[in-house]
Amino acid sequence: MDPGTVFAGYRIEEEAGRGGMGVVYRANQIALDRRVALKLLTPALASDPGFRARFQQESRLAANIDHPNVVDVYEAGEDDGRLYITMRWVEGSDLRQEIESHGRLDPVRAAEIIAQVADALDAAHAMGLVHRDVKPANILLGERRGREHAYLTDFGLTKRVESAGGLTQTGQWVGTLDYIAPEQIRGEKVDARSDVYALGGVLAHALTGHVPFERDSDVAKMWGHINDAPPAPSTVVPGLTPELDAVVLRAMAKDPA
């Protein structure tokens, strides 16, 4: 949509990003004169009754998470046949952009960011909500009280359209392959431990500048998640502490019990 377009009571300011689920715009909520992130989902998702029902349910749950490290969900609805969700606009970047622009993070900074995201996940898991797609792009980095502050986003989009074998009906795996838990690949039931696995992978990426299983194909990545132990971060970046190694290896253990 072009800047100035009004959609569902929101005036579009600019496109902020796009992905497989849809397009994110920076927008202004006209009634409250409030800047928001407006995510407009693809028509294919809007046309699927199963997804629509889950989207509404998950969005309501996400809106009830009251935690400083979770992006506030303001509204989820449908207008002119398009599903949308609006969230707090966070001024800043995201963890993916930070790693792509600057490489691996200072270990203290990486640990602080991941600890904040872990707190956000604890709050969600206490409500029975599993994120299922924890990745650097969903970790927004802003500022709060003069300090860097991490926000976990996309909670309203955590239940994907699944068919046999764990694939979505559009042919995409549930979750991002660089961080996805083995049980998600196998199409098995997921719970909070799947998010912990993914967060361990994100920590490894932040500490080393490399994803846990850098492989030439998606199939090889999936094989790694299912069968191989992730490399300890200190084997990639000498000097990282055994304590950080232990956190990553425990989070990404194949048996999460």
Where are these regions (language model features)?
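Conserved short submotifs of the Hanks-type protein kinase catalytic core
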Residues: D80-D94, E98
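Activation-segment/catalytic-loop signature of the eukaryotic protein kinase fold
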Residues: A76
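Activation segment of protein kinases
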Residues: S47-G50, G142-K189, D216
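Protein kinase glycine-rich loop
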Residues: E13-G19, V24
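AlphaC helix of the eukaryotic protein kinase fold
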Residues: T42-N64
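Hydrophobic/aromatic scaffold residues of ePK-like serine/threonine protein kinase catalytic domains
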Residues: N64, I113-I114
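C-terminal lobe helix-coil module of Hanks-type protein kinase domains
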Residues: N28, A115, L121-D122, H131, ...
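Conserved N-lobe loop of protein kinases adjacent to the ATP-binding glycine-rich P-loop
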Residues: N28-R35
